[in-house]
């Protein structure tokens, strides 16, 4: 999926939805900017295997998204402003293994998150599959430390103790001891 259009201010207003087979509820439902790791309409150059965000606002998604019979992709502009969207979708018609999983992505937002409350990234997932990661855009509204969020994974019936328990939000994103801006110390 390679969309492109003018207007960073619309990245949160353009909603990407992807439906597999005859689904009535989308497996992917996310603002376009957030799907491409550009939260709050802020440009972030990304060069990774599954996602690239290039100068000039070109978004490229290379996640494998197999389907068997039907795929429907929609883009909904929820703003009052008209825009033009350019896109390219590449696909191959081939046999899909029976155990092949469908791609899913969701958007979750709490604004503001009450101090000291648990923020759930992904909840109540059923079935087999692979969790491939999280993109998170956050802001701090106080002078307190934001990092010790302790990312926890409760898997396959865990209740009292998680299968995986991290040491802090910044560590989950490979930024041990913060992502402090060396110039502003923010």
Give the residues covered by each predicted segment:
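Beta-strand-centric surfaces of beta-sandwich/beta-rich domains
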Residues: 2-186
């Amino acid at each position: 999926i390679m969309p492109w259009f003018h207007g960073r201010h619309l990245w949160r207003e353009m909603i990407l939805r992807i439906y597999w087979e005859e689904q009535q509820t989308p497996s992917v439902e996310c603002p376009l900017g957030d799907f491409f790791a550009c939260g709050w309409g802020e440009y972030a150059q990304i060069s990774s295997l599954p996602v690239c965000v290039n100068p000039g606002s070109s978004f490229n998604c290379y996640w494998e998204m197999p389907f068997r019979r039907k795929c429907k992709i929609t883009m909904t502009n929820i703003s009052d402003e008209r825009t033009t969207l350019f896109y390219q979708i590449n696909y191959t018609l081939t046999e899909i293994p029976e155990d092949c999983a469908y791609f899913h992505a969701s958007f979750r937002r709490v604004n503001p998150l009450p101090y000291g409350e648990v923020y759930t990234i992904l909840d109540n997932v059923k079935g087999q599959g692979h969790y491939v990661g999280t993109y998170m855009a956050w802001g701090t509204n106080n002078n307190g430390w934001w990092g010790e969020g302790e990312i926890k994974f409760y898997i396959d019936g865990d209740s009292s103790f998680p299968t995986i328990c991290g040491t802090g939000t910044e560590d989950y994103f490979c930024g041990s001891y913060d992502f402090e801006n060396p110039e502003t110390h923010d």
